[in-house]
Amino acid sequence: MPHTQITLDCAQSQVPRVEALLEALGALAITLSEPDDEEILEPGPGEQRLWSHLRLTALFDAATVDPLRLQARVAEVLGAPPRGWRVERLVDRAWERAWMDDFHPMRFGDRLWVVPWGQTPPAAEAVNLRLDPGLAFGTGTHPTTALCLRWLDGLPLQADTRLVDYGCGSGILAVAGCLLGAGHCTAVDNDPQARQATADNARRNGVGERIRVQGPGPLPRAGADVLVANILARVLVAMAGELSPSVRPGGRIALSGILRGQVDQVRACYSSWFEMERPEYQGDWALLAGTRRG
């Protein structure tokens, strides 16, 4: 399948907003590099980007992306035409998997490790999630995914826990929840490629029978003990009336994909349903958690 690669330069302070826009417009993968092209991909948990300007390279399905429209949207976010804008058409799949060279085992919380498929877990006695995300979002290296993984690691998930992973991407949160003890998970995504990646990763980790993968649709009322949604803030706002009642009274919710400046807006949409906790932050990104009111 041919792909279109978009490259641009922007200030570090603008990266989260541009990343969020590119993801919303269908980016399959995003690479970050410093001016001399030393790739860092996504920073690991606790790491900080050290350069004042960064280069973003995003991969899109060539059949669905409009580079001119995309350039105009990026210019709106930046307030000026993007610097270093370059459009390339790619034929082979080698670039899509380049991140694998820099994807190493990572620990989240007290128990959970995310380990690239084919590598040896550093701690055999830990909860080890073997991951091959394909082209779906979610390796654990992005701050939003890392925040959600640490949150799940801190929950007392049990065999009767019903988990919903809304916007499942690679399935990393659904699989992690089941490996950490949840008996059943419903994983939802509108992208067929993400649903396939989730099913594959669930099977490889031995939890395929406990994860139901589906496209968007009505969720059972009060059917979830735990719901995690790592999507964009504007989608969380729009779906508050659908996601909130799907969590049972006393159940837990975690919302991520939220920039610092979007926290108050998202919290306001869910606070009538949930007793919201103080946000957790990693860099410019936030996680909001809460307990469903009775």
Swiss-Prot record:
Pfam families noted in UniProt: PrmA (PF06325)
Gene Ontology process terms (BP): methylation
Primary location: cytoplasm
Reactions catalysed, as given in the entry: L-lysyl-[protein] + 3 S-adenosyl-L-methionine = N(6),N(6),N(6)-trimethyl-L-lysyl-[protein] + 3 S-adenosyl-L-homocysteine + 3 H(+)
Location in or out of the cell: Cytoplasm
Binding positions for S-adenosyl-L-methionine per the UniProt entry: 145, 167, 189, 230
NCBIfam families cross-referenced by the UniProt entry: prmA
PANTHER family to which the protein is assigned, alphabetical: ELECTRON TRANSFER FLAVOPROTEIN BETA SUBUNIT LYSINE METHYLTRANSFERASE (PTHR43648:SF1)
Name by which UniProt lists this protein: Ribosomal protein L11 methyltransferase
Organism annotation: Alkalilimnicola ehrlichii (strain ATCC BAA-1101 / DSM 17681 / MLHE-1)
